[in-house]
């Protein structure tokens, strides 16, 4: 099971260079398992035991496995994650031609570690909107090949490089794509028109707009002397999306189960398809007959917010509280913050710990050092919007928000096992 899950995760990461591609990959896997797509613009005719999914903005997805009994009786088991990761996104008018090189201006998306983006073989993917035969359409593209790089400045020209330096995103991050003649002018949108023709065999009249991200072309891989680790891009938080999907597909539950994977978590979740928007609430309201049933059902439900946790790094162990240093390959982490940066409380933490003990899955705890600030997740946002009880958990990770992150190769199986048990649980606290 562990090897198959790890291989599946690596394949999923490769197919998901952007939130758009991640959502499409999740939808493809759901459809292969018999899930039916629901269109938010249509009326829904769902049936007990039915399997459905809905997307918004092509970058967020909610999968629903309706129970044979009404959700009002035993509540809904929900797992939440997010599809986005920090990256470099192309600006609307990006062409830069400097010193005979074609470069693209980029904007930093989210709280990225910037130094690891240098000297990497980069490709470009995302969503393109165009006009064809008088109609406005959109399509996903992925160049796949390494078409760009951000070369470092040689240490001979920057003698203090190893003493730390502040990276200027405006000046130092535009990737180089090609050499060009002095009088040659490159139209980036024309390049996108060519890519649409290559990848999808369609001829666009004009590219109207796009949302494109650079990404590292190096595939995720099992690494380490004994294969103890998985190294790859976007583990935060496609790792949790994949674990939630596998648990949902494996759970033969009579209860109603939901997996929600939101976009825009890395930039605050405040969007129509983010956790701070109405997507999940509106979806649940459409599944329940009236307002009274909705409130009662939510109060009988529970959300597991799954997002990567900071593993204790052997070179920087002092960055953790001495009693709360999550270790890689030692199981999922319950995340606690009394200032509500995480939504965990004693009841939800106790229930998750109970599930882990019942499944013989190791479990850990994390609380940030008292002299450091704490990050957050979709957990508190979802809890405050729905009023649903929530526990924040995640798998220990190194180099979070780097272009290449690291997690334990045993932990995915641990997380899938306990999330499957959660979906199967007959009673919630």
From Swiss-Prot:
E.C. designation(s): 3.4.11.-
Keyword Metal-binding in annotation: yes
Binding, Zn(2+): 82, 156, 401
InterPro entries, sorted: M18_aminopeptidase_2, Peptidase_M18, Peptidase_M18_dom2
GO cellular component, one term: cytoplasm
Alphabetized NCBIfam families for the sequence: PRK02813.1
Protease listed as a keyword: yes
Gene source species: Pseudomonas putida (strain GB-1)
Keyword terms, alphabetized: Aminopeptidase, Hydrolase, Metal-binding, Metalloprotease, Protease, Zinc
Entries under Pfam families matching the protein: Peptidase_M18 (PF02127)
Protein name: Probable M18 family aminopeptidase 2
One GO term of the biological process aspect: proteolysis
Molecular function GO terms recorded: aminopeptidase activity; metallopeptidase activity; zinc ion binding
Cofactor(s) needed: Zn(2+)
Family: Belongs to the peptidase M18 family.
């Amino acid at each position: 099971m562990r090897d198959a899950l790890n291989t599946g995760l690596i394949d999923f990461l490769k197919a998901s260079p952007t939130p758009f591609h991640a959502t499409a990959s999740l939808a493809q896997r759901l459809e292969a398992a018999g899930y039916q797509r629901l269109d938010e613009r249509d009326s829904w005719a769902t049936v007990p035991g039915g399997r459905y999914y809905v997307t918004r903005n092509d970058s967020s997805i909610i999968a629903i496995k309706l129970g044979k009994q009404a959700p009002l009786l035993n509540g809904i088991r929900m797992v939440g994650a997010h599809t986005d990761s920090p990256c470099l996104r192309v600006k609307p008018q990006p062409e830069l031609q400097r010193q005979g090189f074609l470069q693209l201006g980029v904007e930093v998306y989210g709280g990225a570690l910037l130094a690891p983006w240098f000297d990497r073989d980069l490709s470009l993917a995302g969503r393109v909107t165009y006009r064809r035969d008088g109609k406005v359409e959109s399509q996903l593209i992925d160049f796949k090949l390494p078409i760009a790089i951000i070369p470092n400045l040689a240490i001979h020209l920057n003698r203090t490089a190893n003493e730390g330096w502040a990276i200027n995103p405006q000046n130092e991050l535009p990737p180089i794509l090609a050499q060009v003649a002095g009088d040659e002018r490159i139209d980036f949108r024309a390049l996108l028109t060519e890519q649409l023709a290559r990848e999808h065999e369609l001829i666009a009249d004009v590219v109207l707009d796009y949302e494109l991200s650079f990404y590292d072309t190096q595939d995720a891989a099992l690494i380490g002397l004994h294969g103890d680790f998985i190294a790859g891009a976007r583990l935060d938080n496609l790792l949790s999306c994949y674990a939630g999907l596998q648990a949902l597909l494996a759970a033969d539950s009579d209860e109603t189960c939901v997996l929600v994977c939101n976009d825009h978590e890395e930039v605050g979740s405040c969007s129509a398809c983010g956790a701070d928007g109405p997507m999940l609430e509106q979806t649940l309201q459409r599944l329940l007959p009236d307002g009274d049933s909705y409130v009662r059902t939510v109060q009988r439900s529970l959300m597991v917010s799954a997002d990567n946790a900071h593993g204790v790094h052997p070179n920087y162990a002092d960055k953790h509280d001495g009693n709360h240093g999550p270790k890689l390959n030692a199981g999922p982490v319950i995340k606690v913050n009394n200032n509500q940066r995480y939504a965990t409380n004693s009841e939800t933490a106790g229930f998750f710990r109970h599930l882990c003990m019942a499944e013989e899955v190791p479990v850990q705890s994390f609380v940030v050092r008292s002299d450091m600030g704490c990050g957050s997740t979709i957990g508190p946002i979802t809890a405050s919007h729905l009023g649903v009880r929530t526990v924040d958990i995640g798998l220990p990770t190194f180099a979070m928000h780097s272009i290449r992150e690291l997690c334990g190769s045993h932990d995915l199986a641990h997380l899938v096992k306990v999330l499957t048990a959660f979906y199967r649980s007959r009673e919630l606290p």
